[in-house]
Amino acid sequence: MPLPDFHVSEPFTLGIELEMLVVNPPGYDLSQDSSILIDAVKNKITAGEVKHDITESMLELATDVCRDINQAAGQFSAMQKVVLQAAADHHLEICGGGTHPFQKWQRQEVCDNERYQRTLENFGYLIQQVTVFGQHVHVGCASGDDAIYLLHGLSRFVPHFIALSAASPYMQGTDTRFASSRPNIFSAFPDNGPMPWVSNWQQFEALFRCLSYTTMIDSIKDLHWDIRPSPHFGTVEVRVMDTPLTLSHAVNMAGLIQATAHWLLTERPFKHQEKDYLLYKFNRFQACRYGLEGVITDPHTGDRRPLTEDTLRLLEKIAPSAHKIGASSAIEALHRQVVSGLNEAQLMRDFVADGGSLIGLVKKHCEIWAGD
């Protein structure tokens, strides 16, 4: 399929996607019943969309195009009420988190969807293994060239986004010792990590044309990059965050990305170059492994900085942009999180350290989601 022209969208508008866990009480393992919930809510959602993701244990909640985080929060809140009622009617529960702490990937059923079945044919068992749960944020751009500039700018802050959203310390019944283990699942994919270097939209079109020769890439949706342009929507999509445990944190993360995008495209503070990516995977690893306690390294100077310090610096830089787009509350909440030194991964470990079981942890996550 040829790459569509870049659809011009209103700059800095938002679209947010949350991949939620569908679980079966009282054992709180993953359920294979997302199709039941989708059928139950399909005529009750007035804004946004509830739909399938790769496997039947995943339920995606997606907003419409939103002006700001307040509009997005309102849409999510309305969807949440409908989904929670449908889940209760079918003896299911819903929660966030980047991974289910003890599910077995071998049990996961790929959705009966042409695209997902084609992906299963291409990637085999890897598709069942990617039963992990992330938050994706789309930001509107006025042109393809703006999208490429924004993608490179946001890529500088991938470690910050990962550390602030880290919520996947447990996998397959084991403490992984990572704050965010979810991104590791994609490491076997040939398109894992950052997008190959291009400097403008024309070069991106040539890149996509080359990738399509492999026959594994039919559309942008088939690419698993950390951040990717979405020409159909006229957006840049950030894909590195774990699904938070609360709607409020999900909205705050979206506000962070929206404000960062506003700062980047308004101020144009960087002259991007390919060398920017030399230490990308090392810095990304630091955020996944250690969360806010990680250390990132500047590929140009060799300077090493605590991720906590650099995140506070970012929040300070984007504060004026956040004020202009109505996202100041998000930046203030994230500032408090950084100062506290906590992320959701640490809260999960604290629960288990205090004697909680992994079953109890999922139950707790369901209570948190329903109570937010």
UniProtKB/Swiss-Prot annotation:
It catalyses: L-cysteine + L-glutamate + ATP = gamma-L-glutamyl-L-cysteine + ADP + phosphate + H(+). Homodimer. GO terms for biological process: modified amino acid biosynthetic process. This is Putative glutamate--cysteine ligase 2. It comes from the Bacteria. Pfam families: GCS2. NCBIfam families: gshA_cyan_rel (TIGR02050), PRK13516.1 (NF010040). One of its GO terms (molecular function) is ATP binding. InterPro entries: GCL_type2/YbdK_subfam, GCS2, Gln_synth/guanido_kin_cat_dom, YbdK. Belongs to the glutamate--cysteine ligase type 2 family. YbdK subfamily. ATP-dependent carboxylate-amine ligase which exhibits weak glutamate--cysteine ligase activity.
